[in-house]
Amino acid sequence: MTTLKLRLNLPSNQAEQVERVQVAVKRKQAATETMEEAWARILAMKNSDTDRQRLLEVKRAMEAGKIGRSPADAGKRFSKAEALRLWRQLAELERERKIAELVAKTPGNYRLITNEAQFESLLEALKNEPMIALDTETTGVDVYEDKIVGISLTLPRADLHVYIPIRHDQGEQLAPDYVLDGLKPVLEDDAIGKVLHNAVFDIHMLMSHGINVAGLRWDTQTAMSLLNENEESFALKDLATKYLREPSDTFETLFGKDAKFNTIPLDVALVYAAKDTHLTWRLYEFQRHHLSKMPTILKYYEEVEVPLLYAVVDMERTGFLIDVEYAKQYGEEMRRDIEAREKALKEKLGDINLNSPAQLKPALERIVGRKLESTDAKKVLKPLKSQFPVIAELLEYKELVKLHSTYISVLPELIHPKTGRLHARFNPMGARTGRFSSGGNGVNLQNQPKSARKLFVAPPGWVILGGDFSQQEIRCAAYFTQEPALLEAYEKGKDVYATMAADFYGKPYEECGDGTPERKAMKIGVLASLYGTGPTTLSQQLGCSVEEAKEFLDQFFAKYSRVKRWIDETKAFCQRHGFVWMDKQQRKRRLPEAKKRPKNWEERGEVARALRQGPNAVIQGTSAIQTKTTLVKLHELCKRKGWKLLGTIHDEVLLLVPETITREDVAEFERVMLESYRFGNVPNKTDIEIMRRWGEGYSVDEWFANKQKEESA
């Protein structure tokens, strides 16, 4: 029997109907897929770790009956997108459950202060407290613009943890001025000790509300850095979970990323805010217990790191005045220079995008006549710039582009609209060695190039007084190593690099002065030896072969044997104990990898890296102690004189002082710089400049000579 094949040429509208029927059939078939089959299909997809975790949470919740599909989706094929929508619902349900549980389990000694009788009773109780924990809840993190929503306090002696709401959207609460005026005498009383977590922020916020917090005794965030600088997180909730065995959710986990504390209901706000100071107090007790077993560290913390936080607050609040008009003019000149350089480079390299490695690499390979590993400036291009002028021009062009786009055009945009200043943030625990870092608010003062520093100016009637710790780390190395060549140079007040270069290369001292290749090589070599820099990296820094760099290091260590001995002894101590001490055992740098017995090449590299860091950490960490101790003393000087701390950048300290400053004032500043912290028998030195514009300074003699001319004119 012959099978007939019919070909139907249907009108287009009928074809569409057939297609719709076929889609409906497929949809019906998909709808008959079991949930088990659907999950198998979805989990077999290429999912990120985060998505997979969320999908599994939804699967378990659906199987437990905690969540289900909406009626609108019931007839559709179960998809990954729907599953992730369900995860968001599940997360919301979990947030609501956690919040309800928190409120239900609110401890009896957590009190909400919402009327005058309760507040007056609290003020009476505070009179009996030698120390309290303090925290603020705010509308945001802008310490100059945002508002305090509420204040939480822990009263250990009374065993009370209270929250005082003052700007919540709903609920009975006291007027902000009434509460702040009432708390002001307590918070400004130095006799009542204060414990905070991230104290700088809260001190800033309260200062913006007319309260100058006195009596800071402890900051659990900075104290943690002395107990373990290698913590993954210094957030209160993370530390409480880890050390107090008190699992605590973050604000974002409980309330969502964009939530504002003023929108949180008061019963919820109480348990969250009061728990913050409760945990802060418990963490303080934990930290003090452990630091009391290390009395030298505890003494350093209380005498330097704690008072330093007040200096940090004042530095940040002072802020920098930016010369906006100069920035515009300088930026326009720079833009024209960049365009001219770009045009000249394209004439030599071709009409390419100079910022595209894919286009730049082949163009450069044609110039150098060989393949290049990459267009990396430091590793590949800098070693070639002396041979190929076009590469030197390219590097200059890239530096200009970076300077313009990262600094000159950006700095004026970072001026705070309320204060008219650029406010950097200073983190006294920015590096694990204890060195400062500067960041936040979009500006990093540590990497401001000299050209960009011109934008920072003193306000009318003021000047910038700057002093550096001259050759701070090398003086520190001289102290630890007691290397005769270093000690002799400093005792005689000579340039240490020139002295060592003359000794090392067998040349007269006068021929190894500033700017000579010998002095430059010695400066790089000394720092490289202290920091464990290998021959490969040193060869790039010196612009020589690896063999020549290795020979330099061998000769250096042979000639300066005490440096080598100290480095070896420090590494041996680190390998035995897994840490190194800073000067006078005031801080530790923990390097646990140094104690490992390596089982493979990767672990061997980790051990070698940790051992290299040991001597480096001692030098950098002890230098940081000198800087911080001096800053505390300078802060005291500023308060006496009516001056202002402006900033600390690398080994430089900046102050704002009246332009009527006298030689006696400068001498007092110099004494503090030189005498606050000594490296044993190694004399300190500071180079002082007086500036109207940062980076364009006068020596002390030049400044006062100019002043004398102006007055006599």
Please state what every model-predicted region is.
Residues 219, 276, 280, 308-317, ...:
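Catalytic palm active-site di-aspartate
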Residues 560, 671-681:
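A common structural junction motif
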Residues 6-13, 28, 39, 43-46, ...:
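Active-site-proximal helix-loop-helix substrate-binding element of RNase H-like nuclease domains
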Residues 214-215, 242, 249-353, 481-491:
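Mixed-charge, glycine-rich, non-catalytic linkers/tails in nucleic-acid processing enzymes
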Residues 90-94, 105-113, 128, 133-142, ...:
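Acidic, glycine-rich two-metal-ion catalytic cores of nucleic acid-processing enzymes
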Residues 2-88, 162, 230, 337-463, ...:
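Non-catalytic nucleic-acid-binding interfaces of large nucleic-acid enzymes and RNP effectors
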Residues 198, 248-249, 272-288, 295-321, ...:
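Core structural elements
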Residues 226-229, 313-338, 477, 534-547, ...:
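Catalytic palm subdomain of template-directed nucleic-acid polymerases
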